[in-house]
Amino acid sequence: MKLLQTPLYQECKELGGKMVPFANWEMPVSFSGLIEEHNAVRKNVGMFDISHMGVVQLKGKNIKSALQNLVPSDVFRIGPSEACYTVFLKENGGIQDDLIIYDQGVLDTNEESVVLVINAARKESDVEWLSSNLSKKEITISEFMPEGALIAIQGPESISTLEKILEEPLSNLPRFGHRTITSNPNLINSQESIFIARTGYTGEEGFEFLSSPETAKSIWKSLIASGVTPCGLGARDTLRLEASMHLYGNDINLDTTPFEAGLGWLVHLEMPNDFIGRKALEKQAEVGTQKKLVGIQVLDKGIARKGYPVLYNSETVGIVTSGTWSPTLQKPIALAYVPSEIAKVNTQIEVEIRGKKHPAIIVKRPFYRKGF
């Protein structure tokens, strides 16, 4: 099957992006090099083409009431121009996807609207699942800004850099706040708009914005001209792992629940509303989990990768879900599921790397925290 290309594919190629297959897309894994890109985001500012992500709009009546039946988080805690991170669940409590819900309030058409940003690899199944569960509601499901380009700009200098380019005040936009910009010198067409949110996947200050391909290309080039470092999937992965942000398919999947994955804070059992997976999570909240996701530091130079066994008292007890060399901390880090009874900070364990046992220790998550 031919790989899909984002609207910024050519721009990435021209900057030397090394393209690789990812979730049926052809995406840049790196430009100048993973370490340089990683450090640019931690110390200055970098940007990513994330146009492969799924962006879906729900419009109609009583949107949030309908959506509340599908997620374990209280969506009424957010209002217009606010957003929240949450998960879709199966009846057994397993995670179907993680996503961000953006509340757009009531549109000019007198319809309620929310925008969902979902994982690229789960887009098709998520939309089918939404359609099935919302079929009896007066709700339309469509792609938000079809053919649009989505850019993430991340790092301590992201606010000042983006404010200069967009000529728009952004420091007053709260974390997980969002707005639609309809009048801006960067807009190629006066009928267009820029959807911008103070969100990210790096553990740093940052924004993500969606616009038409033409406007996105113009802003992309302006950001490059201002010295912003283009970054690929490689740096995006090391940055998110340092911040202990989950990667669907690695750290969370249909066989893991929010309580097991350290995402219990997303489950609001105190609200009266029923939701898919509630009974399973109520039971797990009562009796506890058999496994938990933990942070691991390998104590030598060995790098734990997805699928590597975790040992305790010389017995295999778990498996690594994500692992890398941390450019910021200068040590090997990983996430892994282990039995709940040993999921305690400072527990001595081992990771088997290419047939050899390496000493490791369970540590606090996130490995890196800055600002938030």
Curated annotation (Swiss-Prot):
It is an enzyme of class 2 (transferase). It catalyses: N(6)-[(R)-S(8)-aminomethyldihydrolipoyl]-L-lysyl-[protein] + (6S)-5,6,7,8-tetrahydrofolate = N(6)-[(R)-dihydrolipoyl]-L-lysyl-[protein] + (6R)-5,10-methylene-5,6,7,8-tetrahydrofolate + NH4(+). The glycine cleavage system catalyzes the degradation of glycine. One of its GO terms (cellular component) is glycine cleavage complex. It comes from the Bacteria. Belongs to the GcvT family. HAMAP family: GcvT. GO terms for molecular function: aminomethyltransferase activity; transaminase activity. The glycine cleavage system is composed of four proteins: P, T, L and H. Disulfide bonds: none annotated. GO terms for biological process: glycine decarboxylation via glycine cleavage system. This is Aminomethyltransferase.
